[in-house]
Amino acid sequence: MQDNSSHSRESASAGDDPLGIDKLTVDYDYLLYKIRDYVQSIQLDTTELCKKQNEVMVNGIIENTIDKNIAKFKELLEKCDTLENHYEMLNQLAIITDTFKERIAEAVNNYNSLKKGASKSK
């Protein structure tokens, strides 16, 4: 048997946010967290690679490590591409939010027009 009070709370919660703004806020915060994490990861990888490259140059151990360094730099570039994709997601969110009010107003106007048309035909 299901507890009716918990079911009504769940229904009320879903009804409180029919447009999913709370979920969008959480998703936006998570995206910012992922971007921050990627930036920190790239920073650490870059610092490590630069230190290793400096050691290679100082110690003259170039032959065996060039391929490893190239592979690590490729990984770093892939992370940069992923970061760029996250920023593109943010740009898309900005575009959506910039036009949100206009789209809502247009939807309300369309609804009102349909409502007036339906009442005239009665």
Swiss-Prot record:
Query: CDD domains this protein is in?
Result: BLOC1_CNL1
> Spans of biased composition, class Basic and acidic residues?
1-10
Which keywords describe this protein according to UniProt? Answer: Coiled coil, Cytoplasm, Transport
Q: Report the record's disulfide bonds.
A: none
An individual GO BP term: endosome organization
What GO CC annotations are associated with the protein? BLOC-1 complex; cytoplasm
InterPro entries in UniProt: CNL1
> Coiled-coil segments, which residues?
63-95
Q: Where in the cell is it found?
A: Cytoplasm
First-listed, main subcellular location of the protein, grouped into a coarse class: cytoplasm
From the UniProt entry, list the residue stretches annotated as the region Disordered.
Answer: 1-21
> Of which family is this protein a member?
Belongs to the BLOC1S4 family.
Biological function:
Component of the biogenesis of lysosome-related organelles complex-1 (BLOC-1), a complex that is involved in endosomal cargo sorting.
PANTHER family with a match to the protein in the record: BIOGENESIS OF LYSOSOME-RELATED ORGANELLES COMPLEX 1 SUBUNIT CNL1
Query: Assembly state and interactors?
Result: Component of the biogenesis of lysosome-related organelles complex-1 (BLOC-1) composed of at least BLI1, BLS1, CNL1, KXD1, SNN1 and VAB2.
Protein name as catalogued: Biogenesis of lysosome-related organelles complex 1 subunit CNL1
Native source species: Saccharomyces cerevisiae (strain YJM789) (Baker's yeast)
- Which lineage ranks, top first, belong to the organism behind this chain? Eukaryota, Fungi, Dikarya, Ascomycota, Saccharomycotina
What gene makes this protein?
CLN1
